[in-house]
Amino acid sequence: MTAAASTPLRLGLRENLAQFSLLVGVNALVGGMIGQERTVLPLLARNEFRLTAFTATLTFIVAFGSVKAVTNFFAGTLSDRVGRKPVLVAGWLIGIPVPLLLMWAPTWGWVVFANVLLGINQGFTWSTTVIMKIDLVGPQRRGFAMGINEAAGYGAVAATALATGYIAEHVGLRPQPFFLGVAYAGLGLGLSVLFVRETRGHAQHEATLHSLKTAHASDGEAVDRLPSTKEIFMLTTFREKALSSCSQAGLVNNLNDGLAWGVFPIVFANAGLSIGRVGILAAIYPAVWGAGQLYTGGLSDRIGRKRLIAGGMLTQAAAIGWIAATHGFTQWALGAAVLGAGTAMVYPTLIAAIGDVAHPAWRARAVGVYRLWRDAGFAIGAILAGILADAFTPAAAIWTVAAITAASGIVVIGRMYETHPAASRAQIHLPGEHVTTA
């Protein structure tokens, strides 16, 4: 008998700490890949490629969000079929050309193409690191684990946005700011190939602890079978109240992020702020977002998911409205910090709620569907903000997004039920599973 066969798989953060910590580091590198664009690319569009229309400038976010959304869906399906690690490695291979294209792109079309590749890279790598951590920790500390995961990723987004802003102010918008991306891609690929281990077996082990039931039809009859991908899509998008509530909230959350990524830097620069100060503002939002998740992820394990999701969406709406209504570095810095706090309440909690409800046997695909809708928010937000900013004013676009965000929070309040057993009197009801309270 081999050592691997004689050692039973164990769920839990402490039991899998080394591999979990490695995946946190890998996810930080994933975040750094997107962070290299947060400050520089909107300014590159305006200053070097002479794009004046918001709809033209934001095409890179539309390309990124559309491709990442679809890739998320396939990442979940592929990771169930071929394993998590091959999908992770493929994502890093696709990401290697991205910083090189951004350095030397002769036209804006090449920048858009680089973001197509970045969308695939992010969809494969971030999805699989999320799924792998969920596999490893089991159900008890899922929110805490997602908080650490997202804190690492968005902490790296913030640090890289700040660093690239500093570099760009002193030596130019390119190529030097994108040297960081070259280092991130090489290190991420090396760690994933050499040290990351497959975790699909942990999900299969957890699945043996659950009854495999799902809705057979609209009458809710439960049957012991694995649902089809189409059924999982419908459950996560429409039919299951908690899953669908999380999907719409995730979409609106990233609609906000698309606005912050593509519109805010141009608004700040047009107001006369230096590239360095724009970089600071671009970093504050993901920095608070990232650091806050270290607390909010674990908090959702104690007080439940619903309150944090609804409260976070309403906090984001207030912050976006504040940014639209005020002017100046200090006021905008405050708005960015509050926006980051609201996002920190929502981001790890949404993915933890998906993990609460979805059965381990089809959880990766449910995560993929959720992330499809969530990252479609990038594209929808860029299109909406671009059209409104060009037709009216950037302020009109920002106010509209604030209203949509508030409406999303109200939907969560009215439709979602609490999914975490520690915060709910009843046990979690899987789709179609008939559960009685103790």
Per-region residue spans from a language model:
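Symmetry-related core transmembrane helices of the 12-TM Major Facilitator Superfamily/SLC fold
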Residues: 176-193, 398-414
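Helix-to-loop junctions at the C-terminal end of transmembrane segments
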Residues: 71-83, 168, 292-304, 389
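Cytoplasmic helix-loop-helix junction between adjacent transmembrane helices
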Residues: 114-154, 352-353
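Residue-level signature of mid-helix packing/kink "hotspots" within the transmembrane helices
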Residues: 64-73, 158, 286-294, 378-379
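Juxtamembrane intracellular "pre-TM" segments in multi-pass secondary transporters
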Residues: 2-17, 202-246, 428-438
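Helix-loop boundary and gating motifs at the non-cytosolic
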Residues: 14-65, 244-245, 249, 253-271
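Helix-loop junctions on the cytosolic side of multi-pass membrane transporters
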Residues: 193-209, 413-425
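Structural signature of the two symmetry-related core transmembrane helices
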Residues: 86-100, 182, 307-322
